[in-house]
Structure formats: C-alpha cells, structure tokens
Amino acid sequence: MMVRMKSKIKISGKDAFGWFLICISVLMLCKSLALCFSNDIWYDELFTVGMIEHSYGELIHFTAADVHPPLYYCVTKFFVDLCKLVLPGAGTVIPAKIVSVLPYFVLLLYSVTWIRKRFSIFTGGMFLFCVIAMPQLPAYTVEVRMYGWALLFVTAAFLHAYGCVDRCSRKPYLHGAALVLYGLAAAYTQYFACVAVVMVYFYVLAAFWRQDKRRIKEWCLYVALSIVGYVPWLFALARQISTVRENYWILPLTWRSLGGCVKFLMKPAFTSEPLNVVLAVVMFAGYVEVVGGSLIRYRIGSKRSREIENAGHAEILKEAEKIYHNGRVLHGAAGLAVLVGVVLFGFAASFLIRPVFVYRYMLPAMGCFWLSFAIG
C-alpha cells in the first residue's frame, strides 16, 4: 500500500504580504500602461519626441550640443522605430510613453528573483511598491523622459554592488561586470545618475576596505573600465560643463532647499494640503524608525556576534545575526547614503560653480533610497 506524502509549502504572513505588494504593484504598472494611450505631453516631453525623429548620428550630435547624454534617446528611438516597423502608421508619443514604463517591469523581475533570493519576497514587494507608488515617482512612470531608465540603471548597479561585497556571493566578478555595465548605462543616461553611481562605487570601496583590503585592486579595475567606457563622451561632457558654467536655467539654492528635498521625497500630492503634511511627517518618521532602528539592531547584533565568536561559540549564532554580520543592514544604509551623496554633490556644485540641482535630479537615486527602507 502506497502512502502519498503531501508536502505543504508554508508561507509566512510577512512573505504573503510581500506577494500581495507585488500583485498591487503589477496592477499599478498595468494602469500606467493604460495611461500611455494618450497623446498629451508637455514641453520637456516634446523635446524628447522631436529628438528621436532624427537619425542616430544627428541625435548624438544634438545631445552633445545640449546638456544631456544620449543613451535614453537612442533607446526610445529604437523602440519607437520598432513599433512603427511592426505597426505601420503608429505614432510616436504612445510608444515613447511605453518605453518609460518598461524599466519598472525590469525592476519587477529583480524584485521577484534577485531581491527575493538575497533578502526576502517581503523586501522585494515593499521595494517595488515604493518605487512605483511613493510621492513624485508615479508622475514620472509614463513621462517621456529619462528618469525611469536612470532609476533602473542606478538601482541595478547598487544591487550588483551588494553581489560584489557580499561574503556569500559565489560569482563576485560577474556582479562586478554588471556593476560596470549598469554604471556606464546610468552615466550615459543622466548626469546625476552618474553621480549616484559614483556614490555606489564609494560604497564598494568602503566595503572592500572593511572586509579585505586586497580587493581594492579589484575595485580599481572596475573604476578603470568605467573610465575607459566613458572616454568617448568626455569631450562632449567638457563642452557641456563649459556651457552650463556660462549660463543655465536653474535657480539658486538656499539652505531651505534641504527641507524641500525631504518634502519632494515624502510629501504626497492629494488635494488636501493638511493631509499631505500629516502623511509626509508620518512617512518621514516611519523611514527614520525603520532605517535607524535596523542600524541600532545591527550594532547590538554585531557586538554580540563578536563576543560569541571570541568565546569560541560561533556555531550558535542566530540566523538573523549572521545576516547582520554579512552586511545586509549596512547595504541598506548605503542606499540612503547614495541619495544623500547626490544631494550633497548637487548643493556643493550649485554653491561653488553655479546652480545645477533641482529636486527631480534625486529620482535616479530614489530606487536605492526606497530599497534601504525595504531592507530595514
């Protein structure tokens, strides 16, 4: 007589909520796709639409003469031309809007695979929900601009940076290659995305310095490859910097603008202003509690781990303490540091040279910012 053993897959409440957030996020992405089927655009989007009507050579020439790198426009032109090839008579605006939604589907894949395996599906679901639904971000999901792609490239570079520094990673060099490629893609997409990637590289350097100083040579290799990969655009960048130094449209910053950065990150856009203020305060307090609390627990857990190891009982470390010890929480804190670094760079450049920073230039680093919250 054969007895059939029925295996039951147990899903914790936290994981179930993570999958729920994934489903909600997918529904929001589907809604974003539905919103693409409109020809309504504003001035900056009109610039993109006009740019992709040119050949690739002209497009690169015009972006070099302006203040933008060319990758986003090339990607958008390729997709729009492909749509027109498959569907003769198709317009330009709708396919261009769809291009802006595509990066979030890539982040969906990262959430249910890469993030789920290394952190949890709860972390993946919370991250994806945040980068789609948190203040400011929904407005740029379908906008015909480069911010969604810049956010994808910076976030992916940051994720693979964790693969580089994680002691449990089996193929750190593959993650290093992905870091270089995504970093270059970010630098060729938007300049403050390039700044964000520089902050990611500083994080990797700090992690190597802390873990194994011999790996700093590996970090130097990644940096050298990135510089070589960006050489073709350096002359155009130098001309653009010279142009911006002489004249640019951005208004001067004040120290009150730092508060504006927090409002940009946390303040919703409901019709009730008092409600927006209350929600912004609650969200800010929640973010500080989650990220700050995880750092405090890390310090306590790390100290306890060292005491146990010094006593010769490393085998009794709890799994949570191992996770803290392997740098998960520090990686989460580094996500916040990436955004802070972008803001500090923007303010420093604006005060020392001329104003070059507006709040939306934080968008490329906001994936790292909300990943920090999800990890915490």
Spell out what each predicted region is.
Residues 1-4, 165, 169:
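N-terminal leader/targeting segments
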